[in-house]
């Protein structure tokens, strides 16, 4: 059946899960390496170092933390959408790519300190997660 064929291959939506898993590390890398102070000594306790940051570097780390919070929900939505089989693969792929785009925009908004816009982008991303469930019902 088409459902089993779809489960047996790495769809674009599945690749988006992989991207979502690694995307939060962009925040950590930005916070650590695009400013002064991070080196071998700071690497002994990187969480302590990150807790001392301020401004855009602190926001970059906060974006990372939010990425870790939302990724499990996105991964679950993609997996369940594939298993349910109620939606065309192209639609699942489009929703998953849109979610990744929303996460990149979220990171940019967080880094720039655009709180209200960041919140709207966050809601859009959560809506895309919900949409993955709804279209597959």
Per-range role (PLM):
Residues 104-127:
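Interfacial loop-to-transmembrane junctions
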């Amino acid at each position: 059946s088409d459902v089993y064929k779809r489960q047996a291959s790495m769809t674009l939506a599945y690749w988006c899960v992989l991207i979502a898993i690694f995307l939060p590390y962009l925040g950590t890398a930005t916070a650590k390496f695009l400013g002064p102070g991070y080196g071998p000594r700071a690497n002994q306790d990187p969480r302590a170092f990150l807790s001392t940051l301020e401004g855009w570097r602190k926001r970059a780390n906060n974006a990372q933390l939010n990425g870790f919070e939302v990724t499990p929900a996105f991964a679950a939505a993609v997996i369940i959408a594939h298993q349910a089989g109620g939606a065309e693969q192209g639609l699942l792929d489009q929703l998953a790519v849109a979610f990744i785009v929303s996460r990149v925009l979220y990171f940019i908004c967080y880094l720039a300190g655009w709180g209200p816009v960041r919140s709207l982008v966050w809601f859009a991303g959560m809506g895309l997660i919900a949409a993955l469930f709804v279209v597959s019902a």
